[in-house]
């Protein structure tokens, strides 16, 4: 039997298991025209937490850069941060589409993902591939407005975004690939005409902080699918450390808080940063870890959304207050 015939048979069997009437997973998607619905799903328009998680590294990096810069940053600070956030949104969206293309046959075997557009046949491979390429190109259009070195940073981030789905297939550590979103720190510094290597240790500590928070969030999500991931042959740190996930999650809370303290200490931050930024991060993520420990499969997205949003807000507020306090 040819590969094409086998693929067609798998697609047919997948469709046979689908409900006759498809209901969009959120009100946001239900408002889209029917022809746009699968593309909205590919972009994860119904998963706003993902947009928060990809934008916050650039917002945090901007506040951090302003705090450690030897002089007041240029007047176009906010326009450049906006361009970086728009880049991150399109990077995330294109990455989600690419992930669905690479994982469609695995997604068909997992209850939470079997109704995604590709497994249910709502879009073809070629349509999804063109859509992913167009989405990435839109992101690069924003990067083109930044200093030239940012294009190199963007290509590095794109490489890891494309690599991610294969990390799930060939290892139990795809979250380490996701952690490379920490590259937002040097990219933002380049975008603001700062040299990351002039502040190597604070920059590395902040990179580690962003990476550890991203890894922790994804492990919390992956915990929902451990049984099905094992059956489907999908690797993750949640699968690898399934018997000590609570300990790992709490360790990541403490490790990320320690990285933030190191970044603040070496960046000459003051009391407002350690009280508001570090305290807010530690408090909210400790709450999230405890909530996940009590019930890892119920209300995870609700708790994660509120904790991440609140912790990010306090992190940035602490940096801004600290900057004003020291000026």
From Swiss-Prot:
One of its GO terms (molecular function) is 4-hydroxybenzoate polyprenyltransferase activity. It comes from the Eukaryota. It is found in: Membrane. Pathway: Secondary metabolite biosynthesis; terpenoid biosynthesis. Its EC number is 2.5.1.-. GO terms for cellular component: mitochondrial inner membrane. Polyprenyl transferase; part of the gene cluster that mediates the biosynthesis of anditomin, a fungal meroterpenoid. The first step of the pathway is the synthesis of 3,5-dimethylorsellinic acid (DMOA) by the polyketide synthase andM. DMOA is then converted to the phthalide compound 5,7-dihydroxy-4,6-dimethylphthalide (DHDMP) by the cytochrome P450 monooxygenase andK, which is further prenylated by the prenyltransferase andD to yield farnesyl-DHDMP. Further epoxidation by the FAD-dependent monooxygenase andE leads to epoxyfarnesyl-DHDMP. The chain crosses the membrane at residues 49-69, 81-101, 140-160, 174-194, 201-221, 244-264, 271-291, 307-327. Keywords: Magnesium, Membrane, Transferase, Transmembrane, Transmembrane helix. Pfam families: UbiA (PF01040). Signal peptide: none annotated. It is a multi-pass membrane protein. InterPro entries: Prenyltransferase, UbiA_prenyltransferase, UbiA_sf. It comes from Emericella variicolor (Aspergillus stellatus). PANTHER family: POLYPRENYL TRANSFERASE AUSN, PRENYLTRANSFERASES. Its cofactor is Mg(2+). The keyword 4Fe-4S does not apply. Disulfide bonds: none annotated. GO terms for biological process: terpenoid biosynthetic process; ubiquinone biosynthetic process. Belongs to the UbiA prenyltransferase family. It is an enzyme of class 2 (transferase). This is Polyprenyl transferase andD.
